Design a protein with these regions (language model features):
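Fe-S-dependent hydro-lyases/dehydratases of central metabolism
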Residues: 1-838
């Protein structure tokens, strides 16, 4: 999803440089860039053998235009390689194949060795920190600047030490560990900081365990979650088929540079430290809508009941005095008409009978409708994947089956996963539980979970049910996994299979049976849970280095669908198609002059959205399904795209017309200007008209009214989604005032020329008495803009009264100031190239 808009930007920059009188071919990566196509495939088909083939065919059918752009980029750019779709997830491919740990090159006849470093256009780039490689996620616009030779600037971070001791107990997995660490570090506060793991416990973790911990750095807020090189690193490099001379180089250079950890290595000095005894980790999930909200497996049923009232959609309610009894809605009738026989309200109140595959199934609050083994976070770890396979084997042998209403999926981050599950003999058991491979990509984790069966969808939507997903992913933000699924829980692949067997989350898995065997005996989770010895022995016998060398020897080849794509004639300029709804030339460089206009104050601004705490980039720029009745869906229909061909917002990121219409359009976003009503709508002021965010923005822009957004803490948490900033500027938003910003989104706002402003300590929209209906003047931008300065804000209410306050300008360096005054980072680079400075 981030690769296509990056290439679109680079292609547009070539046009822009030509228009400014420069040589367009100078827009070319000077730093090696690998683009792995992993975000496009969706779970349209599942639960049968041909699901993978059909999903891939559908992927190419939907994304032919986008992939043709990437084929052009392969030919047009040097230092640029593409890993075709169907290969795996970028971070797992990096871990298993691309990462060198220690690079070498010849310079002036001398061999040079230096540590591997990288930036990636996905926040989970940090996964490679588990291999001893320093790297993190950045916005696509920052990555483009780095590719073009611009240095990456950052403030020197504090380093928090996370000490690990002990050994994981039986029953606990690396997933349980990372959810525990995420909870701890979020509470400690590590946003903008480096986290480094140390302590004797590191020797008791495999490298895939470490990669799992490093992967979820964005979820606990850190820039990186670093593990030093040690013996496990070398073992992993050998185990993934890396050449012997490379492994020797990594060991020798790391030791020479003092980068190699042993149990005798002294504890480093840190800004602050935390400690976790691995022996205390226990089976856990996280949810229903934040990765840091860990739930002990033993408390899962009670926690769901406690969370349920807050998850019920507007217009529906739980019956008074009970947790989940009668199905009610304010102002609506629950009578089932003669033409609605596919969905029938059951006697039990929050329960509906829906027809599915010829049988009646009960859908209620807490029903699991999606169970997905997904994401590089966990599918990169053979222990939890084999654990899931062993549990599936024991379940099948006891006669258990997945509940029929559960949409199952297994989407490994690497083809090697399928190889070792096949070699171990476990894949057939997973398939008997309908966990067939549906693709090699991000899929459910990114929101490409595909549609639910029509009758189940209708039962949920019409009755306001709070259904659940259980996935082995890294994020569960509101409406990310599926728009109709309000309770989403992160867990290990082993627990994903377990919850698919039960079909509900309101169950005590320690004491209630998963089901009953053929003799009617109850089968408890403990009865089929794999032992550590079973997992260890299976991994040792099934996983071979040759699997990695075989798969990655053809990593750039692609399947017959990729090879069938037309290879464009080599051209330095991309041939934009005026009628394309996937790839359009963006407006960011249109009419740009060589000279930079001075920064100006923001006057008579209106609030487009007044938002609360922990607004994610998913809230700001959704990745999933495009609602047909909202502006983006209307645009596509006006351009003769049928609803069935909408694809997702993520796949449309090469078209700014779609993306700006979807900005702040998440179905779960709550604009407090509308008293927290869900959806991408706002109040146009001063008329009071309720409009979509996009339509209100267009009306404001016609009147030349600048816009701002006001928000709470952790604004922009989540994915490194540059479209959350691109869409913001295209909607005419000049500034965002928040209590705090997540690192990547703050950088993205600056990189797009949007001013990030932070309330001073102790101040919030509530304490200041802001309603969002005021007219705002932000002064001091024109005459005192410098790193870390303050500017003045005057908010004039409808009755003429004023609220005055200062805000901190989150331009953290001189480079930030330069980017902002140029209108963005890419505009800065383009001007420098046109002047011959770069």
């Amino acid at each position: 999803f981030t690769g296509v808009p990056a290439v679109v930007d680079l292609a547009a920059m070539r046009d822009g440089l030509k228009e400014l009188g420069g040589d367009p071919s100078r827009i070319n990566p000077v730093v090696p860039a690998d683009l792995v196509i992993d975000h496009s495939v969706q779970v349209d088909y599942y639960g049968f053998e041909d699901a993978f083939r059909l999903n891939v065919e559908k992927e190419f059918e939907r994304n032919g235009e986008r992939y043709a752009l990437l084929r052009w980029a392969q030919e047009a750019f040097d230092n640029f390689s593409v890993v075709p779709p169907g290969t795996g997830i970028v971070h797992q491919v990096n871990l298993e194949y691309l990462a060198a740990v220690i690079h070498r090159r010849t310079e002036n006849g001398t061999f040079m060795a230096y540590p591997d470093t990288l930036v990636g256009t996905d926040s989970h780039t940090t996964m490679v920190n588990g291999l001893g490689v320093v790297g993190w996620g950045v916005g696509g616009i920052e990555a483009e600047a780095v590719m073009l030779g611009q240095p990456y600037y950052m403030l020197l971070p504090e380093v928090v030490g996370m000490k690990l001791t002990g050994v994981l107990p039986e029953g606990a997995t690396a997933t349980d560990l990372v959810l525990t660490v995420t909870e701890m570090l979020r509470a400690h506060g590590v946003v903008g900081r480096f986290v480094e793991y140390y302590g004797a416990g590191l020797s008791n973790l495999s490298l895939p365990d470490k990669a799992t911990l490093a992967n979820m750095s964005p979820e606990y807020g850190a820039t990186i979650g670093f593990f030093p090189v040690d013996d496990q690193t070398l073992s992993y490099l050998r185990g993934t088929g890396r050449p012997d001379d490379m492994v020797r180089r990594v060991e020798y250079i790391s030791k020479e540079l003092g980068l190699f950890r042993t149990d005798l290595t002294p504890d480093p000095d840190f800004t602050s430290t935390l400690e976790l005894d691995l022996n205390t980790v226990e089976p856990s999930l996280a949810g229903p809508k934040r990765p840091q909200d860990r739930i002990r497996l033993a408390e899962m049923s009670k926690q769901f009941e406690a969370d349920l009232p807050a998850l019920v959609p507007t217009g529906f309610s739980l019956p008074s005095g009970t947790n989940s009894t009668s199905l009610k809605s304010s102002g609506e009738s629950w009578e089932v008409g003669a033409d609605s026989g596919a969905v029938q309200v059951a006697d039990d109140a929050r329960s509906v009978l829906a027809e599915h595959n010829g049988q009646k199934v009960e859908i209620k609050d807490g029903t699991v409708v999606i169970a997905s083994i997904t994401s590089c976070t966990n599918t990169s770890n053979p222990s939890v994947m084999v654990g899931a396979g062993l549990l599936a084997k024991k379940a099948v042998e006891r006669g258990l089956q997945v509940k029929p209403w559960v949409k199952t999926a297994m989407a490994p981050g690497s083809q090697v996963v399928t190889d070792y599950l096949t070699q171990s003999g476990l894949l057939p058991y997973l398939e008997q539980l309908r966990f067939h491979v549906v693709g090699y990509g991000c899929m459910t984790c990114i929101g490409n979970s595909g549609p639910l069966p029509d009758n189940i969808h209708a039962a949920i939507e019409d009755n306001g049910l709070v259904v659940a997903s259980v996935l082995s992913g890294n994020r569960n933000f509101e409406a990310r996994i599926h728009p109709q699924v309000r309770a989403n829980y992160l867990s290990s692949p082993v627990l994903v299979v377990a919850y698919a067997l039960t079909g509900r989350v309101d169950i005590d898995l320690y004491n209630e049976p998963l089901g009953y065997d053929s003799d009617g005996n109850p089968v408890l989770l403990v009865d089929i849970w794999p032992t550590p010895e079973e997992v260890r022995d299976t991994v040792a016998s099934a996983l071979k280095p040759e699997m990695f060398t075989s798969r990655y020897s053809v990593v750039s080849t692609g399947d017959e669908n990729w090879q069938a794509l037309p290879v464009p004639d080599e051209s330095s300029l991309y041939d934009w198609a005026d009628d394309s709804t996937y790839v359009r030339r963006p407006p960011f460089f249109e009419g740009m002059d060589l000279e930079v206009a001075p920064a100006s104050d923001i006057r008579s601004a209106r609030v487009l959205a007044l938002l609360g705490q922990s607004v994610t980039t998913d809230h700001i720029s959704p990745a999933g399904a495009i609602p047909k009745a909202e502006p983006a869906g209307s645009y596509l229909q006006e351009h003769t795209v049928e609803v069935k061909d909408f694809n997702t917002f993520g796949s449309r990121r090469g078209n700014h017309e779609v993306m700006m219409r979807g900005t702040f359009g998440n179905v779960r976003i709550k604009n407090l200007l509308l008293d927290g009503r869900e959806g991408g709508h706002t109040v146009h002021l001063p008329t009071g008209d309720e409009l979509s965010i996009y339509d209100a923005s267009m009306r404001y822009q016609e009147a030349s009214t600048p816009l701002i957004v006001i928000a709470g803490k952790e604004y922009g948490t989540g994915s490194s989604r540059d479209w959350a900033a691109k869409g913001t500027i295209l909607l005419g938003i000049h500034a965002v005032i928040a209590e705090s910003f997540e690192r990547i989104h703050r950088s993205n706002l600056v990189g797009m020329g949007v001013l990030p402003l932070e309330f001073r300590a102790g101040q919030t929209p509530e304490t200041l008495g802001l309603t969002g209906r005021e007219v705002f003047d932000i002064t001091g931008v024109a005459d005192r803009l410098e790193p870390g300065c303050t500017v003045d804000v005057a908010a004039t209410a409808e009755d003429g009264s004023q609220i005055h306050f200062e805000v901190n300008v989150r331009l953290d360096s001189e480079v930030d100031v330069e980017y902002y005054t140029n209108g963005g980072i890419l505009q800065t680079v383009l001007r420098k190239m046109a002047r011959g400075v770069m």
